[in-house]
Amino acid sequence: MEFVMKQALGGATKDMGKMLGGDEEKDPDAAKKEEERQEALRQEEEERKAKYAKMEAEREAVRQGIRDKYGIKKKEEREAEAQAALEANSEGSLTRPKKAIPPGCGDAAEEEDESILDTVIKYLPGPLQDIFKK
């Protein structure tokens, strides 16, 4: 039977044993090579991040030069100034913006309206109560 299998597969049985989970030839330096590969990947990643940070710093320097040249402010600076101006104007001003209505303040009036309507319906005769309840 073995002879027939060897003839049919043409010498591929050695590889078949390995593929099926048989004895594998282990490289004694495999762990060392894997560790070196991982270290090389880490170094490449660090170099890539450093290069990206350097490019971004250069871009920001160019952007800042353009802002200085044309008197443009950063978005964060504009927002901070607008917020400060709004707060300064609203401290003693009569025209300060109205405060938002806290949640739940307008709900009580609606509940009162419903309860008043219910009390009025209670005093109506039976057939009229049925009409209003629908």
Swiss-Prot record:
What Pfam families does its record include? Synaphin
Subcellular location field: Cytoplasm, Cytosol; Perikaryon; Presynapse
Biased region (Basic and acidic residues) positions are: 15-81
**What organism does the UniProt record list as the source?**
Bos taurus
Q: Which family does it belong to?
A: Belongs to the complexin/synaphin family.
Quote the gene name from the UniProt entry: CPLX1
The GO terms this record gives for MF are:
SNARE binding; syntaxin binding
Subunit structure, as described in the record: Binds to the SNARE core complex containing SNAP25, VAMP2 and STX1A.
Show the taxonomic lineage: Eukaryota, Metazoa, Chordata, Craniata, Vertebrata
Q: Which domain of life is it from?
A: Eukaryota
Q: Which CDD domains match?
A: Complexin_NTD
Q: Which GO terms describe its cellular component?
A: cytosol; perikaryon; SNARE complex; terminal bouton
Q: InterPro entries, per this entry?
A: Synaphin (IPR008849)
Enumerate the residue ranges of region (Disordered): 1-112
Q: Which UniProt keywords apply?
A: Cell projection, Coiled coil, Cytoplasm, Exocytosis, Neurotransmitter transport, Synapse, Transport
Ligase as a keyword?
no
> Could you identify this protein by its name?
Complexin-1
Task performed by this protein = Positively regulates a late step in synaptic vesicle exocytosis. Organizes the SNAREs into a cross-linked zigzag topology that, when interposed between the vesicle and plasma membranes, is incompatible with fusion, thereby preventing SNAREs from releasing neurotransmitters until an action potential arrives at the synapse. Also involved in glucose-induced secretion of insulin by pancreatic beta-cells.
